[in-house]
């Protein structure tokens, strides 16, 4: 309840069976929600480059094979130089293989992890933002035209106009980006995705409220006082974007 946006309505005593919604209910209104699921792999954007790369390798090097497989998968052209001794990398101030060098820009890329981070696929946040805006408008419309089996559910929906946006395929995204599930970069990507979703939904909700007015129980809620969901966690959150 400390993190509820319905603190002005009453105490929430339970969730639904799947626990994906936490809303207020009483004998006069039964909480329901209008949900949509976003398939995150649809928003993977492949990285393209026309730069010419040089991949320094040596015989019987598994990481050398892996970096070449990665570049092939990304459709990035390169030429391979198989070195006989590590001293051949001295001009580049590097002592391990594989080593990738960007000839076009005349700069070093680095080893396998550096190459993956530089040329891996990314999340198209602009497309995700646009999708969430559309979903928010659609879910808002569903509230008005939906079939309600009992009047208590309709009363709840009309008073609070709740919507929920979830995701699927986050693990698939990490696989496509070749990122460890528990790595710091995976955690940041996760935060960035939901930051985009939250912002886009709030932005569209504001646009709708400008035309239709706020929902009935808006005034007195945390959001009506400028307290967003991340403000209710008792922690400092700083966006890096």
Where are these regions (language model features)?
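Internal maturation/activation junctions in enzymes
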Residues: 131-154, 158, 162, 180-241
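Local sequence-structure signature of Cys/Sec-based thiol-disulfide redox active-site neighborhoods
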Residues: 48-81
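Thioredoxin-like thiol-disulfide oxidoreductase module
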Residues: 79-96, 101
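Function-dense linear segments that define catalytic or interfacial modules
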Residues: 1-50, 120-155, 169-173
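Hydrophobic/aromatic-rich, well-ordered segments within soluble, folded domains that form packed cores
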Residues: 162-180
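Non-catalytic, surface beta->alpha helical segment in thiol-disulfide oxidoreductase systems
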Residues: 103-119
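Surface-exposed charge patches
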Residues: 69, 73, 172, 207
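Conserved beta-strand scaffold positions in the cores of enzyme catalytic domains, especially
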Residues: 35, 78-80, 108
